[in-house]
Amino acid sequence: TLLASSAASDVYKRQIEDTSWIRPVKYVGVWWEMITGKSDWAYTRDVPSVQLGVTDYAATKPSGRHAANNDNVRRYIDFAAEHGFDQVLVEGWNVGWEDWFGHTKDYVFDFVTPYPDFDIAALNDYARQKGVRLMMHHETSSSVRNYERHLEAAYGLMNRYGYNAVKSGYVGDILPRGEYHYGQWMVNHYLHAVKLAAKHHIMVNAHEAVRPTGLCRTWPNLIGNESARGTEYQAFGGTKPIHVTLLPFTRLQGGPMDYTPGIFSMDVSKLNPENHSH
């Protein structure tokens, strides 16, 4: 049957012999409180235009809404440890989120510099003490060449602090202009990112990336992709009930999916009273 067939992946040759470091994980994260507007990715609202390496965040006024702060992340780590989750995804940990979207900005993130209220060493140590890990987040703002320039250093930082998985993101129009999320240039980029991640023993969960085509057989560290509407859409206008029943016969034929399950309350006003996108 179609569901039992592995034809899509069988045509690929495996490139990783020792896969003992690769395994799916269950994770929780701070993203939901951000996307609903309860909190922010950005550390401050004082800086309309960030210059990485120049902007002094210590001299700015914190907004008080930054979700990726030490105390909040520890709460998520405690929750993960108590309820059997493997990892905690922390978005908004790194500098640059103040003007990340909609500005066609090339040098938007450096993927290695944390905000002042995110102690990367202490939080990773705390997670290990609790028997869980932090999951890295690399939002690129679709500034792809910038990501590639920093990719080796970004993966090196992950190795240094004990991260073994990254959720990457490609929100917005691709830079350089003229390239598209599903074009050949971007397909080459996704492959490059996954291959380099394998060198560093890092699993990749890519969001806004091209629909998988069986490549996870060759590079099984491509542990999951988004590439379809996940659970969050149930709170953003909803999807038709048939959607989930079709996924095994369509999207999932190409490889595993990060469906972002576990969102149980679709009334987002409970998190943010000003948001009524039930």
Whereabouts are the PLM-identified features?
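Phosphate/adenylate-binding glycine loop and adjacent helical scaffold
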Residues: 23
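Conserved hydrophobic/aromatic pocket- or pore-lining residues that grip, position, or stack substrates
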Residues: 28, 80, 127
